[in-house]
């Protein structure tokens, strides 16, 4: 399980170093193989260990190619999907189309989301956090069916 936010840098070759605390689980449980694709609702990237991505692919396989919305979803997620592997220094290469999609520059945030990571431009991440806080403050959480029994 991946949790926490880490500030990392994108090098001049388009690589990022995965924080040390995640490298061993990624190597041992997933042979260092990661699939990167786009988030369809935000300007960020999603990084899935290969096994987790294969579960997504199984769901995508069940979608219709004749339904415009379902086909569009498949095109976005699969069309941008790139499989990468951790190198000996725990780095992965972010392909240029993915870097462009998420407007990634030098300063990046890697955010654990349990079974995957999100990869954000640092300024976009800070703005997203502000928006999340505003949403949480403005919504009546108890009226949200899925959150009604959620407690910290």
Curated annotation (Swiss-Prot):
- Cellular component GO terms held in the UniProt record: cytoplasm; nucleoid
Keywords per UniProt: Cytoplasm, DNA-binding, Repeat, Transcription, Transcription regulation
Q: Which InterPro entries match?
A: MraZ, MraZ_C, MraZ_dom, MraZ_N, MraZ_sf, SpoVT-AbrB_dom, SpoVT-AbrB_sf
Its subcellular locations are: Cytoplasm, Nucleoid
Q: Which GO terms describe its molecular function?
A: DNA-binding transcription factor activity; transcription cis-regulatory region binding
Q: Which domain of life is it from?
A: Bacteria
- Which example biological process does GO assign this protein? negative regulation of DNA-templated transcription initiation
Specify the SpoVT-AbrB domain's residue ranges: 5-52, 81-124
Q: What is its main location?
A: cytoplasm
Which Pfam families does the entry link to?
Answer: MraZ
Keyword presence, Membrane: no
Oligomeric state and partners? Forms oligomers.
Q: Which family does it belong to?
A: Belongs to the MraZ family.
Name of the featured protein: Transcriptional regulator MraZ
| Organism in which the protein naturally occurs | Shewanella sp. (strain MR-7)
Q: What is the lineage of its organism?
A: Bacteria, Pseudomonadati, Pseudomonadota, Gammaproteobacteria, Alteromonadales
């Amino acid at each position: 399980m991946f949790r926490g936010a880490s500030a990392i840098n994108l090098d001049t070759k388009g690589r990022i170093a995965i924080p040390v605390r995640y490298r061993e689980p990624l190597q041992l449980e997933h042979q260092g193989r990661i699939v990167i694709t786009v988030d369809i609702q935000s300007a960020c990237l999603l990084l899935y260990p290969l096994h987790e991505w294969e579960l997504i692919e199984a769901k995508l396989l069940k979608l219709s190619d004749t339904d415009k919305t379902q086909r569009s979803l498949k095109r976005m997620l699969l069309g941008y999907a790139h499989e990468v592997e951790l190198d000996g220094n725990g780095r992965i290469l972010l392909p240029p189309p993915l870097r462009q999609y998420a407007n990634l520059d030098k300063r990046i945030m890697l955010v654990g989301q349990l079974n995957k990571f999100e990869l954000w431009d640092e300024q976009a991440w800070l703005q997203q956090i502000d928006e999340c806080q505003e949403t949480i403050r403005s919504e009546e959480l108890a009226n949200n069916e899925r959150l009604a029994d959620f407690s910290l």
